[in-house]
């Protein structure tokens, strides 16, 4: 919905009631995800509900989860903002064999997940629209948006055909002239919260910075997490070196 200053709201309504979305991004539970037992999925979803989460964002650099995950999210009342599994890259939509596989994937997953109450929205990918508008200077910017046929045609048609009550947007973040704008749509707030101005990839850890994010809907942000102490100890001789 458009506001008086020209910006736009971004929010979810359930049964006509506007809700507050609190949650986090869901990434694969294990680097070998097939070894994650069903009980672990329930534990993780239950812990999210206990923390008053109302939504997980299914990160497009991960994987589609097994049926039990969607069953637990529906049972515990956690909605899903669900990326299709494409992330941070351009995809060869000029190749018919690739488009065929993309269409099969979209058809299968939208049919498989259509009946789960937890499905709040499908999003086409993780950060690919933003990458095209923001990540590449003119000399190396691709001549066109590779993947457009997938995100603007194949996926939305599959969603509308197989799950017509679930909305679709082509990417996350999305909306606005540059995809990741704080005045419109959802935002991935990585560059705002304290990146050191003179060192491109050095982060300044300021918790207070999260209070200053001017986003309509922050669908991804956070801090880099440290590994467990055992991992550190494998790389250091003694605990005193930590």
Region spans (language model):
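Active-site-adjacent substrate/metal-binding segments within catalytic domains
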Residues: 1-89, 99-121
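Solvent-exposed loop/turn segments at secondary-structure junctions
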Residues: 62-63, 86-88, 126-130, 175-176, ...
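Short acidic/histidine-rich active-site segments
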Residues: 218-222
């Amino acid at each position: 919905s458009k506001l008086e200053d020209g910006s736009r709201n971004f929010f979810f309504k359930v049964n006509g009631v506007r809700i507050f979305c609190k949650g986090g991004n869901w990434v694969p539970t294990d680097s070998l995800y097939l070894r994650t037992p069903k009980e672990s999925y329930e534990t993780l979803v239950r812990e999210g509900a206990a923390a008053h989460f109302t939504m997980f964002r299914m990160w497009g650099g991960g994987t589609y989860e097994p049926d039990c995950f969607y069953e637990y999210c529906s049972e515990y009342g956690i909605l899903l903002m669900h990326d299709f599994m494409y992330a941070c890259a351009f995809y060869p939509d000029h190749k018919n064999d690739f488009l065929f596989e993309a269409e099969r994937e979209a058809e299968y997953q939208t049919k498989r997940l259509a009946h789960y109450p937890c499905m709040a929205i499908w999003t086409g990918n993780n950060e690919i629209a933003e990458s095209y508008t923001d990540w590449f200077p003119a000399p190396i910017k691709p001549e066109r948006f590779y993947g457009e046929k997938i995100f603007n045609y194949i996926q939305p048609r599959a969603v509308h055909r197989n799950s017509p009550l679930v909305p679709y947007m082509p990417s996350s973040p999305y909306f606005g002239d540059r995809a990741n704008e704080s005045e419109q749509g959802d935002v991935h707030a990585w560059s705002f919260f304290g990146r050191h101005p003179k060192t491109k990839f050095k982060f300044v850890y300021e918790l207070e910075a999260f209070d200053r994010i001017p986003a309509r809907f922050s669908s991804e942000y956070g801090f880099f997490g440290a590994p467990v102490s055992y991992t550190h100890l494998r790389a250091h001789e003694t605990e005193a070196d930590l």
